[in-house]
Amino acid sequence: MSESPMFAANGMPKVNQGAEEDVRILGYDPLASPALLQVQIPATPTSLETAKRGRREAIDIITGKDDRVLVIVGPCSIHDLEAAQEYALRLKKLSDELKGDLSIIMRAYLEKPRTTVGWKGLINDPDVNNTFNINKGLQSARQLFVNLTNIGLPIGSEMLDTISPQYLADLVSFGAIGARTTESQLHRELASGLSFPVGFKNGTDGTLNVAVDACQAAAHSHHFMGVTKHGVAAITTTKGNEHCFVILRGGKKGTNYDAKSVAEAKAQLPAGSNGLMIDYSHGNSNKDFRNQPKVNDVVCEQIANGENAITGVMIESNINEGNQGIPAEGKAGLKYGVSITDACIGWETTEDVLRKLAAAVRQRREVNKK
């Protein structure tokens, strides 16, 4: 007589049948493994070389080996694949024009942390209709990343969990940890194992110490629970990431992109730290996208005067300016090339901002020659 199955029909071990477990879980759906998705949507040789080049350039800039400025620019979040690819083609052309002064990486954010609730990004809800088809979201995200990098444009993204990078990180050149998660041990551990530079934003209250601490923590080896490329739970051991840096994004205490704030930030950084990046949006724009060019003017003045600590900037930009709510009819009712999360500057303004920034870099070279 054969033994009875160890697991009940609902998948729970029989020894736990009396336990109150998963009482708030409504259900589980199968999730494709990272390995399967990477086989189904393989990276092209051009895509992989683009990702590697973007990483090398970013590392050289934040460590002071390259005197250009690293620029992370693009939509607050991507919801429209066609618009994202049109934006990328425009940005690639501008990147080629300004490559002597700027190393441009497209901001390609697919997951959004929310203060309370709201649309959480292309991976979580690709159809923007609360169907949460995450498998479709991962497929769309990977195909988009292959397409963007295949035109020779490096991309950067926000890191929100320890699972999604397994699907996409081979195509990424830059990672960001947001203000809400900089203090999280999980995200510091994640950053310690990523194969590209990672920027930690200062806290939402404007304090810098959490980002400085995060960089130091991520530089060390860590051990934590994760998943393998085949989707198997595993203990992950990381090497440590020495290419982490602080992003100044402002906060409740005010902005922190001016010369005084930059000097104070420099004073807080331990010896040997990587350079600073300034986020033109969020607290530094007082959440008004029209202030981003004003932030750029102040940053350009500092760079033109010889400030070498500013090694990067982050800009929220789209084809068309502003943002929009999600209408009742969903994606069909959305305006083309307009953000559905944070408001962004439009393309024409983006060109002006980046050309001014490139000119400031050229002026810094002249100042530093003296």
Swiss-Prot record:
Cellular-component GO terms for this entry: cytoplasm; nucleus
Catalysed reactions, as listed in the record? D-erythrose 4-phosphate + phosphoenolpyruvate + H2O = 7-phospho-2-dehydro-3-deoxy-D-arabino-heptonate + phosphate
Q: Name one GO biological process term.
A: chorismate biosynthetic process
Which residues does UniProt call coiled coil? none
Which positions does the record annotate as the modified residue N-acetylserine?
A: 2
| Principal EC category | transferase
Q: Which domain of life is it from?
A: Eukaryota
**A Pfam family the protein falls into:** DAHP_synth_1
This molecule's function is given as: Stereospecific condensation of phosphoenolpyruvate (PEP) and D-erythrose-4-phosphate (E4P) giving rise to 3-deoxy-D-arabino-heptulosonate-7-phosphate (DAHP).
What does the further note read?
Present with 26300 molecules/cell in log phase SD medium.
Family, according to the entry, reads as follows: Belongs to the class-I DAHP synthase family.
Protein name listed in UniProt: Phospho-2-dehydro-3-deoxyheptonate aldolase, tyrosine-inhibited
Organism for this UniProt entry: Saccharomyces cerevisiae (strain ATCC 204508 / S288c) (Baker's yeast)
What gene is this protein translated from?
ARO4
